[in-house]
Swiss-Prot record:
Taxonomic path: Eukaryota, Metazoa, Echinodermata, Eleutherozoa, Asterozoa
Binding site for Ca(2+): E40, G45
Name under which the protein is recorded: Cytochrome c oxidase subunit 1
UniProt binding sites for Cu cation: H240, H290, H291
Listed EC numbers: 7.1.1.9
GO cellular component, one term: mitochondrial inner membrane
Cofactor: record remark: Binds 2 heme A groups non-covalently per subunit. Binds a copper B center.
Organism: Pisaster ochraceus
Chain residues that bind heme a3: H376
């Protein structure tokens, strides 16, 4: 009975729970890889064997964190759990397809780990650029396994996206019009469209790479009239929307958390927030070549991509200032989720500012492939996406589990994490400005100080992971009953009679839900 409940589940809450647990495990593995990277870089000299094994770990770390930690938790976990509850739907539109979306992920993960383990591993970086990923430079099955892994993960995401889009369009309760949709629902809605439009391009690119490697096509081989730059265009046409896919659901969760703990019914400027999400989604498809400023594009092309990239800062700024306006004049409840949300706004803004620096094509030619870029995207991912995940987790954990986290220890967890990630990534700005390149396992002695500081920070973050495990164990072992929120939130998920809401949310289809707005 239990086995069939979890293997053949058609229940959005069970599938969401599976996603959350899988994402937590993948996050542990990805974190372990990051600690290996930072241990190698803690001192000059070689710790592992050579740059190939180092780059295999870097590649696996990136792909694990993106495809098996952030996306399954944000879209699969929070999306499945919350969206039906927030729109008053009994479940997702296609419950069995929902189950398949999840069960494509573990085999994909196994293929990725296999790609790191066979031959000499996939030491290409997560971008898998040819000719480094060609049959010549990476002979053997490694890259092929990584390609198949991405195919499965992509298929899973496309199926999930179809499911979310259909659910949100067709299964809203009466009275839940699009201009009343909670912001988290909006953010996943836009994210699903981004996935639907970008993943097929990646699938095409990696399929062409697969045939280049195995059946002598020359899509990316100049010897046969191909062009390796074509792969970069195809990859980044997926890769840039992907980074917005990683952060948009986080934006949605942060909007809910800030409005809730500020005691507001809704975030400031709801409609502006919605248009900002949509604008970010559209603009995300128009800026991909800012990842390629160093490959020799025309000056007018570079000028366009510089300008377009800077325009994305406008809707992002609308969101940041709307969050701050939501906080304005409120009597804040300093619960843990709010700390994560405030940390998110501050650190994501810093990451956004370094992004504006890198948008300048002339500056980027100097900073491209240095640790400055690493610092930039870890500020928006490791302190943006991950902080949003923890804000959402600490906020909705009582709803999901029926027990509450320890109020003091969860704040300690936040404090240790905050110190750890900042100590890890802030010094990397200095290393990048001083010219330390990415994807090398060793460096001149001049870079020792900040690398050592950075590695100490990663050790602190590792301790933070153990505190988190303790937090979850402590919550389930003491079984403190959560109290209902003192004030009702503008979203529906808190309005159900029990924590967690019953296995089947409704015994019969609800006729109407009246929202105060």
């Amino acid at each position: 009975m239990q086995l069939s409940r979890w293997l053949f589940s058609t229940n959005h809450k069970d599938i969401g729970t599976l996603y959350l647990i899988f994402g937590a495990w993948a996050g542990m593995i990805g974190t372990a890889m990051s600690v290996i990277i930072r241990t190698e870089l803690a001192q000059p000299g070689s710790l592992l064997q050579d740059d190939q094994i180092y780059n295999v770990i870097v590649t696996a770390h990136a792909l694990v964190m993106i495809f098996f930690m952030v996306m399954p938790i944000m879209i699969g976990g929070f999306g499945n759990w919350l969206i039906p509850l927030m729109i008053g739907a009994p479940d997702m539109a296609f419950p069995r397809m929902n189950n398949m979306s999840f069960w494509l992920i573990p085999p994909s993960f196994l293929l990725l780990l296999a790609s790191a383990g066979v031959e000499s591993g996939t030491g290409t970086g997560w971008t898998i650029y040819p000719p480094l990923s060609s049959g010549l430079a990476h002979a053997g099955g490694s890259v092929d396994l990584a390609i198949f892994s991405l195919h499965l993960a992509g298929a899973s995401s496309i199926l999930a996206s179809i499911n979310f889009i259909t659910t949100i369009i067709n299964m809203r309760t009466p009275g839940m019009s699009f201009d009343r949709l909670p912001l988290f629902v909006w953010s996943v809605f836009v994210t699903a469209f981004l996935l639907l439009l970008s993943l097929p391009v990646l699938a095409g690119a990696i399929t062409m790479l697969l045939t280049d490697r195995n059946i002598n096509t020359t899509f990316f081989d100049p010897a046969g009239g191909g062009d390796p730059i074509l792969f970069q265009h195809l990859f980044w046409f997926f890769g840039h929307p992907e980074v917005y896919i990683l952060i948009l659901p986080g934006f949605g969760m942060i909007s809910h958390v800030i409005a809730h703990y500020a005691g507001k019914n809704e975030p400031f400027g709801y409609l502006g927030m919605v248009y900002a999400i949509i604008s970010i989604g559209i603009l995300g498809f128009l800026v991909w070549a800012h990842h390629m400023f160093t490959v020799g594009m025309d000056v007018d092309t570079r000028a366009y991509f510089t300008a377009a990239t800077m325009i994305i800062a406008v809707p992002t700024g609308i969101k940041v200032f709307s969050w701050m306006a939501t906080l304005q004049g409120s009597n804040l409840r300093w619960d843990t989720p709010l700390l994560w949300a405030l940390g998110f706004v501050f650190l994501f803004t810093i990451g956004g500012l370094t992004g504006v620096v890198l948008a300048n094509s002339s500056i980027d030619i100097i900073l491209h492939d240095t640790h400055y870029v690493v610092a930039h995207f870890h500020y928006v991912l490791s302190m943006g996406a991950v902080f949003a995940i923890f804000a959402g987790f600490t906020h909705w954990f009582p709803l999901f589990s029926g027990v509450s986290l320890h109020p003091l220890w969860s704040k300690v967890h936040f404090a240790v994490m905050f110190i750890g990630v900042n100590l890890t990534f802030f010094p990397q700005h200095f290393l990048g400005l001083a010219g330390m390149p990415r994807r090398y396992s060793d460096y001149p002695d001049a870079y020792t100080l900040w690398n050592t500081v950075s590695s100490i920070g990663s050790t602190i973050s590792l301790i933070r992971t153990l505190i988190f495990l303790f937090l979850i164990w402590e919550a389930f072992s003491t079984k403190r009953t959560p109290i209902h929120p003192e004030f009702s939130s503008s979203s529906l998920e808190w309005q159900y009679p029990s924590f967690p809401p019953s296995h089947h949310t409704f015994d019969e289809t609800p006729s109407a839900v009246y929202l105060i707005k």
